[in-house]
A protein has these predicted regions:
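C-terminal "cap" of GNAT-fold acetyltransferases
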Residues: 10-30, 192-226, 331-351
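Conserved GNAT acetyl-CoA-binding A-motif
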Residues: 3-6, 153-167, 294-302
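Non-catalytic interaction/regulatory modules that flank or connect domains
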Residues: 230-328
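Conserved acetyl-CoA-binding loop-helix of GNAT-fold acetyltransferases
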Residues: 1, 132, 138-153, 162-164, ...
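Conserved active-site tyrosine of GNAT-family acetyltransferases
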Residues: 1, 175-177, 315
Length: 351
């Protein structure tokens, strides 16, 4: 079947837009208009049926990666940096990203998989941007990209965990992830809009995502389990082979600290709590009130911090419910909670 069911679009790539901002101070990146003009003028057909190899990124691949995004998605991606070759060169050099490419003997880039720093921890990266040129989707390239990505994780990245998201409007990516021993730990209901090629009225429906984790090196530590979810979380830890010390929760102290990430294209807002304070209920309530138009709100809570039970009660009181466990998300475990504007369409979720 079409590789379109495999590919993860850059819908969530607003999460890595910070790279563009950081790198502009290092090297003058071209504007979106400059890059698109260059790509328009250099469009050509890549000969199908060429032999290819799967390799780690080389600076000579940068232009080909930008061209691949353009060939597959045109000018629809809202993240400017995906069209800029210099972005890939600098981000790989700075170890903020790590690309794996499918490269033909003539040097054309016909496939891509990439690590990028989305989770807050130092020892975890997200694996995504799984893309293959349409004329190469009937080959082994898609699977070979995954095999290389998960079987040859560079030591210099220092990763304890590889995190990936699998769509729930089909089972293919979930099965591939399971084959490589990544474990599903959370579900983000309706976290993405319907696919661009769905009916104009969005009849395909919003897409839920499974958060899966390949734990390469577990880091045992103490966690506080909110009583309402304790049985579920204890079962998840046991079934996924994660060693934790369960300690009694305590009252929160001080003031709450958090950061908010907003993804307009997905109508999603996420608050990650760095410190659970005595004002956590007001903190969560304000977060919801300040983005009332979002289809989905998410709150990510630190399971190692005193007061997480208070935070869970506060979130539940305004409509949040369990999304799941995020192992070593900030180099320690965090809890995902979510709130949807409307009742989810569970008939669209394939597991």
């Amino acid at each position: 079947q079409s590789f379109q069911t495999f590919s993860v679009t850059y819908m969530h790539s607003a999460k890595v837009q910070f790279l563009l901002n950081d790198l502009q101070g290092v090297h003058r990146l071209s504007s979106r208009e400059e890059n698109l003009a260059r790509l328009r003028s250099s469009v050509r057909e890549i000969q199908p049926g060429q032999k290819f190899e799967v390799k780690d990124f080389d600076p000579q691949d940068a232009e080909g990666i930008a061209a691949l995004f353009y060939a597959v998605y045109g000018e629809t991606i809202p993240v400017d940096s995906v069209y800029d070759p210099e972005h890939y060169i600098q981000a790989n050099a700075d170890r903020q990203m790590h690309h794996i490419v499918g490269r033909t003997a003539s040097g054309d880039v016909v496939g891509l998989h990439a690590y990028f720093r989305n989770p807050p921890g130092k020892h975890i990266m997200e694996l995504g941007s799984w893309i293959v040129l349409p004329s190469y989707r009937n080959t082994s390239l898609a699977l070979r990209l995954v095999q290389h990505s998960l079987g040859n994780v560079p030591d210099y990245l220092g990763l304890h965990v590889v995190y990936t998201q699998n769509v729930c409007d089909h089972l293919i990516s979930q099965k591939v992830t399971d084959r490589f021993k990544a474990r599903s730990c959370a579900i983000e209901l309706e976290a993405m809009p319907s696919r661009p090629d769905d009916a104009p009225d969005g009849a395909g429906g919003r897409i839920s995502m499974i958060d899966a984790f390949l734990v390469r090196q577990d880091i045992p530590h103490a966690v506080r389990l909110p009583s309402v979810y304790a049985a579920v979380l204890e079962g998840m830890y046991a079934s996924r082979g994660l060693q934790r010390e369960f300690v009694e929760d305590d009252r929160p102290q001080g003031m709450s600290r958090s950061s908010v990430e907003s993804m307009d294209a997905a109508s999603l807002a996420r608050m990650t709590v760095q410190a659970v304070g005595t004002d956590i209920a007001e903190h969560i309530g304000r977060f919801v009130l300040e983005s009332p138009d979002r289809h989905i709100h998410q709150v990510v809570l630190p399971l190692w911090q005193p007061g997480v039970s208070v935070a869970v009660r506060a979130a539940r009181s305004v409509g949040f419910f369990l999304g799941g466990l995020l192992p070593l998300w900030d180099d320690r475990d965090m809890l995902l909670m979510q709130k949807l504007r409307t009742e989810p369409d569970y008939s669209k979720v394939q597991l």
